Regions:
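Membrane-embedded alpha-helical bundles of polytopic integral membrane proteins
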Residues: 2-149
Length: 149
């Protein structure tokens, strides 16, 4: 088990450093893929617990928020995040009759996923576009990656 985790960690480190060095839209698309996978895992985790967070809204909202974070115009990031939140609220209002027992928790899980994965994760994309961004992104991500081994 430890050998398998070490090999997967090495692959992730190599691919991650390649994305960081490439920079630009290659990095933005790579980090968007990572954020989408994180949102998918988050949604499945709640689904196993008997809750129903909105899988499509979490994936699309987190991905769009991260993609628009790569743009220097911060208004697009806020627009994408705001539309994601409004879409999540509308989705759960319409789905409330199907899941009345867990409706509030479903909405809370979706909104917290959008905030903690989508909005805060989008700052990884913004961090790379700072001067010396490759240094800052490696400095920010390396301790978390190393501690996960």
């Amino acid at each position: 088990m430890l050998a398998k985790r070490t090999i997967s960690s090495l692959v992730i480190i190599v691919v991650g450093i390649a994305f960081v060095i490439a920079g630009g839209w290659v990095f933005a698309l790579g980090i968007t893929l990572v954020i989408a996978l994180a949102a998918s895992e988050y949604s499945r985790m709640f689904a196993q617990g008997g809750y129903y967070p909105s899988f499509p809204v979490l994936i699309a909202g987190s991905s769009l928020t991260t993609l628009f974070a790569a743009n220097p115009e911060s208004e697009l990031l806020l627009l994408a995040f705001s539309l994601s939140v409004l879409t999540a609220i509308a989705y759960h209002v319409f789905q409330f009759s199907k899941h009345q027992d867990t409706g509030g928790m479903d909405l809370a899980a979706t909104l917290s996923g959008l905030v903690f994965i989508g909005f805060l994760g989008s700052y990884l994309a913004r961090l790379r576009f700072l001067p010396l961004g490759h240094f800052w992104i490696i400095l920010a991500v390396a301790p978390a990656g190393i501690s996960d081994i």
